[in-house]
From Swiss-Prot:
GO cellular component: extracellular region
Family according to the record: Belongs to the conotoxin M superfamily.
Organism: Conus tessulatus
InterPro entries noted in UniProt: Conotoxin
Localization, UniProt: Secreted
Phylogenetic placement of the source organism: Eukaryota, Metazoa, Spiralia, Lophotrochozoa, Mollusca
GO molecular function terms attached to this record: ion channel inhibitor activity; toxin activity
Tissue-by-tissue expression: Expressed by the venom duct.
Main location: secreted
Domain of life: Eukaryota
Name of the protein described by the UniProt record: Conotoxin TsMMSK-021
Length: 68
């Protein structure tokens, strides 16, 4: 009985190797800074269309900043 289970386990591992299972480490990391570069500054909620720049804070990815 145990030898039959061993043979079955061996066949399963040969047919479906563990490397074929996707792991969490294989997924790309989420990069919010890269996503923010894809957004146009004119569509940013802090963009002032009259001044043609972004109000404070300037560290959230909206350029150009309105400097005083």
């Amino acid at each position: 009985m145990m030898s039959k289970l061993g043979v079955l386990l061996t066949i399963c591992l040969l047919l479906f190797p563990l490397t074929a299972v996707p792991l969490d480490g294989d997924q790309h990391a989420d990069r919010p800074a890269d996503r923010m570069q894809d957004i146009s500054s004119e569509q940013h909620p802090l963009f002032d269309p009259v001044k043609r720049c972004c109000d404070w804070p300037c560290t959230i990815g909206c350029v150009p900043c309105c400097l005083p």
